[in-house]
């Protein structure tokens, strides 16, 4: 019934596209008049549009004329005229939706339309890409159009100094990678003045390959972290022990990606740990004193049994580098958290980096939801439309192609074993190669791509391998994959964003030419050669895309197919599968094996049957649903932290903007003074119950004041009067500092102390939230909702953090002095440069190994309350402990963390 209605009335997508086509006629009707304009008159349209907006017009009032202007500018500057379907794509993007356009339909050119229109407001537009190469390429190519029309263009890539970034972000249109945008957002919220920040307020973002960024990378947060204790030796010892375990010592679930020790395994590892002297002979792994070791053992188990080199990560230049499972690219600067990366480093016998503590983090889900207006484009989004709508409130509209798709998608072939599958793939590659038909072979991992490469080398078939190991050559290799007799093996969707043109890409070949006296002749020669090869390739059948196995997501399979049949070109696609493939083995093995037995699968024979295709699709849908729920669940939990993050970042900005730091200091001083006095002189208590001795100690610890015991000797004195006296004494301490250092310097010092203290407590709070999150799922066993419990406890922790902030801030303000000899403007400038350098260097490894937030004041602020060597602390005398980190073990020897022991009421 539903299918009949769709045929009669069309789908919702069909109706949307039909309506948009009617709007395109309005743009086309302006084309003739716009073409008559001189270059100068065309450029002046930008000034005219800005004036209209200034006088109250909206973007929708000028959208048709603006699009017509961009179309004409592109024709004059680049020789490219926007097709009608590209204009439709532009309207979809302008209206804050996602446009699905097939590979080769010119998405980069489409983005110029909404980017130009929205940049007219002067608030900036971000065009987001997945890597630096695409950001540079698109800003250079499309920048010519924007510059012609009088708009400025910026490009953000990794490693740029802040000055250059600031200029790029202040441009009308900025091309940047999703990673750099996210990290700049975090870095900006760690800066100590508004002038040091690089980003402008969020306005409008157009995300290229939107499915890759908002879905594939949604579960991986961007993290800026700093070093904690060095446990590299322990990781090495545990790694050697885990290598001695056998297959009966643990059990793993590949569907859920979990691994646990069995009873036999626990006994075995306890004997090994005892033998190495890591635990005492009469203790067990799960005894209280050894509980910290469980984490190291679990991560070593995961490293050895759940992670595979050249599949999940690779080792390059003595470093373990993560591979993106969806793109096959190395995830530069990313490290696994919770000690897993250190366990992998121990496994691969490379230098073990220090563990890190999170200083700031954000997921792409929450970063991109900061934009008031968001849109995106990709070749494959319809399969994920419900998720994009649910999480980002983004509708997806599929735009028809300019030319009809003539690509032929052949049925899958399924074999009993991997060897039989590879034999069939090799036979097809040989056939295609002999007739000159270019072939692109898609694999799901580096390991598989190199395995297949070895098979082709043995057969002496020339080919190129495109995977994370050759990331730098990615665009060049993929661009020439359509040449005559070209054989290219690509990891998953490596090279995405670069079109495969039949016959080859002349522009990339021309880029590498030497500009000598024969330069023009060489260009003509290359163009002629490419044109001839294109004819040969079309005659051979176009690009043949071969998939070596199905991915967990149908969308990734569709992306691979989409590399062929660009702009109406001929082409074919085919997937070869075996029962050994991960998807088949883990999710669909029983069902499909039964079907194959029924159909009578023989060695070396392939099965092609609709039942198998349906079973595979069901398996993929099951995995997609599971991954969607995981991302949705992640967002629910991350939203709790995100709300708190927004509050902290807003407060931080207010502090930086504030011209009067005395207000917060004054109110907090009064609040703490009252709290301390009431703690030792409770309301309604008898005078003999007052603890004046400890009141004096506490007032000195917090406010650096010497409290005179005689003040409470009067019989009629009340706790209110004592509170007023304490507040006045604290104010006197502050005034004496102002007289010594000047009001301006004190204002800067107080602001600096407040910011550094806020950063410290926020860092500790993130650590607490991480630990809370790790164990919260266990609440389900007590019939409690883990999310509700997490919200409740996270709120309590947040309140506790704010209380800690107040006390640590007040304590620091009243206990410091400044070395006036050294506070110079030059010092401030130098320290800021050092900070920027450290932050930039840390992008290579997101651990802020040298992170030292602050200005030169930090060097010259000398607090009386400092950290004391643990050996010098007396467990029975808290006054000898100095400052204790909330996550340290309490110096009283209770075995608890300080925040759960003596620090519980701070």
Swiss-Prot record:
It is an enzyme of class 7 (translocase). The keyword Kinase does not apply. GO terms for cellular component: cell envelope Sec protein transport complex; cytosol; plasma membrane. Keywords: ATP-binding, Cell inner membrane, Cell membrane, Cytoplasm, Membrane, Metal-binding, Nucleotide-binding, Protein transport, Translocase, Translocation, Transport, Zinc. May bind 1 zinc ion per subunit. Zn(2+) binds at residues 890, 892, 901-902. It is a peripheral membrane protein. GO terms for molecular function: ATP binding; metal ion binding; protein-exporting ATPase activity. It catalyses: ATP + H2O + cellular proteinSide 1 = ADP + phosphate + cellular proteinSide 2. Disulfide bonds: none annotated. InterPro entries: Helicase_ATP-bd, P-loop_NTPase, SEC_C_motif, SecA, SecA_CS, SecA_DEAD, SecA_motor_DEAD, SecA_preprotein_X-link_dom. One of its GO terms (biological process) is protein targeting. Its cofactor is Zn(2+). The keyword Nucleotide-binding applies. Its EC number is 7.4.2.8. Residues 863-885 are annotated as: Disordered. Part of the Sec protein translocase complex. Interacts with the SecYEG preprotein conducting channel. Has a central role in coupling the hydrolysis of ATP to the transfer of proteins into and across the cell membrane, serving both as a receptor for the preprotein-SecB complex and as an ATP-driven molecular motor driving the stepwise translocation of polypeptide chains across the membrane. Belongs to the SecA family. Monomer and homodimer. Part of the essential Sec protein translocation apparatus which comprises SecA, SecYEG and auxiliary proteins SecDF-YajC and YidC. HAMAP family: SecA. This is Protein translocase subunit SecA. It comes from Rickettsia akari (strain Hartford). The lineage of its organism: Bacteria, Pseudomonadati, Pseudomonadota, Alphaproteobacteria, Rickettsiales.
């Amino acid at each position: 019934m539903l299918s009949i209605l769709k045929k009669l009335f069309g789908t919702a997508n069909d109706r949307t596209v039909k309506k948009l086509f009617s709007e395109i006629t309005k743009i086309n009707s302006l084309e003739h008049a716009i073409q008559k304009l001189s270059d100068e008159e065309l450029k002046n349209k930008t000034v005219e549009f800005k004036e209209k907006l200034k006088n109250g017009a909206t973007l929708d009032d000028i959208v048709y004329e603006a699009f017509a202007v961009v179309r004409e500018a592109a024709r004059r500057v680049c020789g490219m005229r926007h097709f009608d379907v590209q204009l439709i794509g532009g309207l979809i993007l302008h209206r804050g939706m996602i446009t699905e356009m097939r590979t080769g339909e010119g998405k980069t050119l489409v983005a110029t339309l909404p980017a130009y229109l929205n940049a007219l407001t002067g608030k900036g537009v971000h065009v987001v890409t997945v890597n630096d190469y695409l950001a540079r390429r698109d800003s250079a190519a499309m920048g010519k159009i924007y510059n012609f029309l009088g708009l400025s263009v910026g490009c953000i890539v990794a490693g740029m100094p802040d000055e250059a970034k600031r200029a790029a972000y202040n441009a009308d249109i900025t091309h940047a990678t999703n990673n750099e945008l996210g990290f700049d957002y975090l870095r900006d919220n760690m800066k100590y003045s508004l002038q040091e920040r690089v980003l402008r307020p969020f306005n409008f973002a157009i995300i290229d390959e939107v499915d890759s960024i908002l879905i594939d990378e949604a579960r991986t947060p961007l993290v800026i972290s700093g070093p904690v204790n060095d446990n590299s030796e322990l990781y090495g010892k545990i790694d050697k022990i885990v290598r001695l375990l056998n297959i009966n010592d643990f059990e793993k679930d590949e569907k859920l990606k979990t691994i646990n020790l069995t009873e036999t395994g626990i006994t075995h590892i306890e004997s090994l740990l005892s033998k190495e002297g890591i635990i005492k002979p009469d203790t067990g792994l799960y005894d209280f004193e050894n509980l910290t070791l469980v984490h190291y053992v679990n991560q070593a188990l995961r490293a050895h049994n759940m992670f595979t080199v050249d599949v999940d990560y690779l080792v390059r230049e003595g470093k373990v580098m993560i591979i993106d499972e969806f793109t096959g690219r190395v995830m530069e600067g990313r490290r696994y958290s919770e000690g897993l990366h250190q366990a992998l480093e121990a496994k691969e016998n490379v230098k073990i980096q220090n563990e890190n503590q999170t200083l700031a983090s954000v997921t792409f889900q929450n970063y991109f939801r900061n934009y008031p207006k968001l849109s995106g484009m990709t070749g494959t989004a319809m399969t994920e439309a419900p998720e994009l709508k649910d999480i980002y409130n983004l509708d997806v509209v599929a735009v028809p192609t300019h030319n009809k798709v003539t690509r032929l998608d052949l049925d899958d072939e399924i074999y009993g074993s991997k060897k039989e599958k590879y034999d069939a793939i090799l036979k097809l590659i040989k056939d295609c190669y002999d007739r000159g038909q270019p072939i692109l072979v898609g694999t799901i991992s580096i390991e598989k791509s190199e395995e297949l490469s070895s098979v082709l080398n043995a057969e002496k078939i020339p080919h190129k391998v495109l995977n994370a190991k050759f990331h730098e050559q990615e665009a060049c290799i993929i661009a020439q994959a359509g040449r005559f007799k070209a054989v290219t093996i690509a990891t998953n969707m490596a090279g995405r964003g670069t079109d495969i043109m039949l016959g080859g890409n002349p522009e990339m070949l021309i880029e590498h030419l030497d500009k000598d006296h024969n330069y023009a002749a060489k260009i003509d020669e290359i163009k002629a050669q490419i044109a001839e090869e294109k004819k040969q390739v079309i005659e051979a059948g176009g690009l043949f895309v071969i998939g070596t196995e199905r991915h967990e997501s149908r969308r990734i399979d569709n992306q691979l197919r989409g590399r062929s049949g660009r702009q109406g070109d001929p082409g074919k696609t085919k997937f070869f599968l075996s029962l050994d493939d991960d998807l088949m083995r883990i999710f669909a093995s029983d069902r499909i094996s039964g079907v194959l037995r029924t159909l009578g699968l023989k060695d070396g024979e392939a099965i092609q049957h609709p039942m198998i295709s349906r079973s595979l699709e069901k398996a993929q849908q099951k995995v997609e649903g599971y991954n969607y729920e995981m991302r949705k669940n992640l967002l629910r939990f991350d939203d709790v932290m995100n709300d708190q993050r927004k509050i902290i970042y807003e407060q931080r900005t207010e502090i930086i903007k504030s011209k009067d730091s005395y207000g917060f200091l004054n109110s907090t001083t009064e609040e703490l003074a009252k709290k301390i006095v009431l703690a030792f002189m409770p309301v309604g208590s008898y005078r003999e119950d007052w603890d004046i001795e400890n009141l004096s100690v506490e007032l000195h610890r917090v406010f650096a004041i010497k409290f005179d015991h005689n003040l409470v000797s009067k019989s009629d004195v009340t706790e209110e009067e004592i509170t007023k006296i304490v507040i006045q004494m604290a104010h006197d301490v502050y005034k004496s500092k102002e007289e010594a250092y000047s009001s301006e310097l004190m204002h800067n010092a107080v602001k600096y102390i407040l910011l550094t203290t806020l950063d410290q407590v926020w860092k500790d709070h993130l650590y607490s939230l991480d630990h809370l999150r790790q164990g919260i799922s266990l609440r389900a066993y007590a019939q409690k909702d883990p999310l509700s419990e997490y919200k409740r406890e996270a709120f309590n922790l947040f309140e506790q953090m704010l209380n800690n902030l107040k006390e640590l801030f007040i304590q620091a303000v009243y206990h410091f002095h400044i070395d006036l000899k050294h506070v110079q403007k030059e010092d401030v400038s130098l320290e800021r440069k050092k900070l920027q350098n450290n932050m930039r260097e840390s992008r290579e490894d997101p651990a802020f190994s040298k992170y030292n937030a602050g200005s030169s004041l930090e060097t010259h602020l000398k607090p009386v309350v400092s950290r004391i060597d643990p050996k010098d602390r007396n467990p029975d005398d808290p006054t000898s402990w100095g400052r204790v980190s909330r996550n340290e073990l309490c110096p009283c020897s209770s075995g608890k963390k300080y925040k759960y022991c003596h620090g519980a009421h701070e």
